[in-house]
Amino acid sequence: MAGHYGGNLRQSTRLTIVKEKAKHPILRGVEDMWVQCGGYFANPLQPSEVLVMAQPLVSMKKDAKPDPKRKPVPGAWTRSYESESGDKGRVFTSTYGASNDIEDDGYRRLLINGCFWAVGLEDAIKADADVSFVGPYNATWRRNRGRRQNGLRPQDLAGWETPIVPLQKK
């Protein structure tokens, strides 16, 4: 079960590592996470391993106080499973990920590390890995930065200097 938790476009969220999970490979190098897309409530299926708790804040500012009406809820977790055919797998999930959320270095590192872990490459996760954007990045959610171009094709994004994803020309 998941749903909105807090005031959309009025509240941001601070993500904190669950202390007992701090040594999990996904959390290597992750710190000070803040996301802007508001708050989301989730109740992960069991057996899940919650790595990060999400605390809605009273405003859209990174240093805002916690919303006293909203308790921290799971914000990112893992789950391992075995299918009926016997195949094993594992997933990493986060309730966040709007375009502005990944501008936050800590949160972007969490997502990248989660992808490595999910495909079994946890030994390749380095706390000091460069998680910078490869080219210019245009987050558009909420900030009136413009709309993304329509009709883009993969070849339009081929170069290293291509904006991710280009905005419409005004």
Predicted region positions:
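Extracellular ligand-binding/catalytic regions of CAZymes and related secreted enzymes
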Residues: 59-60, 64-170
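Catalytic beta-strand/loop cores that center a nucleophilic Ser/Cys/Thr
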Residues: 3-86
